[in-house]
């Protein structure tokens, strides 16, 4: 508006220019995250975690799927199709309010199958310890991270950053990665189309990532 006013002679100066340096963009919050060369040690420590198998597997699944912690914690068994190797998260539970389909690697399927033996009769995949009618607490996964010695070095949300970094470095399709992380697509039609189009590619990508983590864990 001010630029137009200057051009048309309605103003002599654009005050917005003077504010350009004063207005700072909000800083993006960075969560502690693992580097590629730290993954092997972390996974070995996680494997030795003496606590709940369900919580340990939840931590691994967070790493293997790239989902947000809240999306994983509130997972219900009706969303998981182990035969097809697909986890369908309804839009109501997604940050972007769009349904999200997560292809499962063979390792992720095995973890869900192990958990099903423990919690499969209930509604939630990861029920609360004291109340199975509620989901696992928000602090559960970060408590696992703390107990295995990685407090301040890793977080549940940080696993998404680690996955994104490694997959980009390996040259995987950026659209596959962004779709898997359920990042926003400003074009809703394109976003819906891409979601279906990239399913096979994302399955291939997540299988590679699961195999990669397995190799690092073995050392």
Identify the residue ranges that each predicted region occupies.
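Non-catalytic DNA-binding core/recognition domains of DNA-processing enzymes
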Residues: 1-4, 19, 104
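Catalytic-site neighborhood detector that most strongly recognizes the C-terminal catalytic loop/helix
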Residues: 25-26, 33, 88-97, 109, ...
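C-terminal catalytic core of tyrosine-transesterase DNA break-rejoin enzymes
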Residues: 60-71, 139-140, 147, 158-184
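Short, polar N-cap/turn motifs at the start of nucleic acid-interacting alpha helices
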Residues: 78-86, 151-153, 172-194, 215-219
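Hydrophobic, well-ordered secondary-structure elements that form the walls
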Residues: 104, 126, 164-167, 177, ...
């Amino acid at each position: 508006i001010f630029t137009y006013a200057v051009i048309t002679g309605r103003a002599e100066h654009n005050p917005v220019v003077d504010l350009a340096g004063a207005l700072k963009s909000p800083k993006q919050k960075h969560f502690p995250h693992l580097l590629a060369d730290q993954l092997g040690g972390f996974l070995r420590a996680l494997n030795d975690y003496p606590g709940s198998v369900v919580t340990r597997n939840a931590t691994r699944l967070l790493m293997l799927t790239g989902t947000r912690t809240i999306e994983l914690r509130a997972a219900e068994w009706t969303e998981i199709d182990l035969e097809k190797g697909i986890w369908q998260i309804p839009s109501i539970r997604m940050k972007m309010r769009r349904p999200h389909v997560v292809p499962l690697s063979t390792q992720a399927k095995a973890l869900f199958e192990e958990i099903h033996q423990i919690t499969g009769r209930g509604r939630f995949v990861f029920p609360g310890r004291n109340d199975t009618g509620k989901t696992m607490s928000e602090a559960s996964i970060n408590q696992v991270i703390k107990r295995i010695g990685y407090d301040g070095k890793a977080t549940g949300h940080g696993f998404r950053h680690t996955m994104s970094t490694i997959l980009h470095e390996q040259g995987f399709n950026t659209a596959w990665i962004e779709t898997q992380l359920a990042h926003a697509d400003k074009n809703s039609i394109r976003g819906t189309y891409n979601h279906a189009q990239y399913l096979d590619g994302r399955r291939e990508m997540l299988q590679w990532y699961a195999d990669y983590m397995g190799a690092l864990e073995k050392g």
